[in-house]
């Protein structure tokens, strides 16, 4: 099984998809219902909240309230530090500045306009 797409549910499809198009540096046709952006072998999709709200389900094993629209997207890049100024120029607020993790990854995290966490990482000591 391979990841084909990570889809985000939002009230502002064009706005959130536009942010990711600028982040990834790819052109895309925007509309208010559904947008898909190719991001390497997988894609990032955006759909309107009213389109998916009836598909929500409870998670009885969760220790507390379930946030039904939360995700973290991981984007692998060659050099985290080289991406930092470009992404900063998009006006993001950093949750974690470029940091080397104990397991060797170099990563930085921020929230997109809808509040989702975005992790941009590189694996300096690994070949992928």
Please provide the spans of the model-predicted regions.
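Conserved beta-strand-loop-alpha-helix junction that forms the acyl-donor binding cleft
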Residues: 7-12, 102
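Conserved active-site tyrosine of GNAT-family acetyltransferases
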Residues: 16-21, 87, 115
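Generic structural signal for individual residues within well-ordered alpha-helical segments
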Residues: 7, 17, 81-85
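Helix N-cap motif at beta-to-alpha junctions
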Residues: 12-13, 78-80
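Vicinal oxygen chelate
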Residues: 1-4, 25-75, 84-111, 122-128
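N-terminal amphipathic/basic helix or basic patch
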Residues: 1, 11, 15-18
